[in-house]
């Protein structure tokens, strides 16, 4: 919210229907919606899901085959896009953190002559890419589409907060959180290595009251997670990374 303070101050004066802002190099986009007497800030995951669903709707209205589309996100982003992919029928791919990996997926589609299959890519850290003109986050295009999407829902009598709530009611409510832990210096690196080693050797049986039903260790070049869609290409392996994913019951992770 702090990053939007100047915009929110101006919004109090001009009373807009939507506040959109980018960072100085215009690769990340944040938004705020006036609702219930205050401004509601959408998370990066929520905006990614909203754009993904809206783009699928636009593709359908334009007579495109939505099931042929490919969307890309990261292994640390919300699991909610998987539910959208299953419902719409498009393919959802998960890559390591970093937009270069999303760009790699675009290159693969381009090399196969199938650029038009790319629906969008996003990270939970407010980075979005719609179109194949770039291989990095593009807040300029994302801002234009966000405004167009807001207009689309306004014609239906909804703001973006209400549109997101409608998706939650349809697909289920997803809560995403990040905890940052610092391990400075050589001793910190050793401690972190010990924690990761312990998790690999003795994985927890439950986390937060949810049973652990699966574990993926990305240090071993794990297979790229894919959901739904055509899945025309052979399975891909992700580059090795010191990341462990625990899958919990009820589609939590």
Could you tell me what each predicted segment is?
Residues 28, 47-50, 99-103:
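Short gly/pro/ser/thr-enriched loop/turn and capping motifs at secondary-structure boundaries
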Residues 1-31:
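N-terminal small/polar loop signature for handling phosphorylated ligands or for N-terminal nucleophile
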Residues 4-8, 49, 147:
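Short, hydrophobic/amphipathic alpha-helical packing segments
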């Amino acid at each position: 919210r702090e990053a939007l303070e100047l915009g929110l101050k101006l919004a109090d004066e001009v009373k807009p229907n939507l506040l959109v802002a980018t960072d100085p190099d215009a690769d990340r986009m944040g938004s705020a919606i006036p609702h219930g007497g205050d401004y509601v800030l959408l998370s990066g995951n929520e905006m990614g899901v909203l754009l993904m669903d809206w783009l699928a709707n636009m593709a359908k209205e334009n007579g495109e085959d939505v099931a042929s589309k490919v969307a890309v996100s990261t292994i640390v982003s919300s699991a909610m896009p998987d539910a959208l992919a299953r419902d719409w029928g498009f393919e959802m791919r998960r890559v390591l953190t970093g937009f270069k990996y999303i760009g790699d997926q675009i290159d693969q589609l381009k090399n196969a002559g199938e650029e038009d299959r790319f629906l969008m890519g996003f990270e939970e850290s407010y980075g979005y890419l719609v179109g194949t003109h770039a291989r990095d986050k593009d807040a300029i295009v994302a801002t234009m589409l966000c405004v167009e999407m807001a207009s689309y829902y306004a014609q239906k009598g909804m703001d973006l907060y209400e549109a997101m709530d409608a998706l939650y009611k349809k697909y289920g409510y997803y809560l995403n959180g990040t905890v940052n832990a610092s391990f400075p210096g050589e001793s910190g690196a050793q401690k972190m290595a010990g924690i990761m080693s312990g998790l690999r050797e003795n994985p927890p049986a439950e986390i937060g009251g949810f049973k652990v039903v699966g574990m993926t260790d990305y240090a071993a070049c794990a297979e790229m997670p894919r959901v739904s869609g055509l899945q025309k290409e052979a399975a891909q392996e992700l580059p090795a990374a010191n990341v462990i994913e625990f899958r919990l019951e009820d589609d939590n992770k």
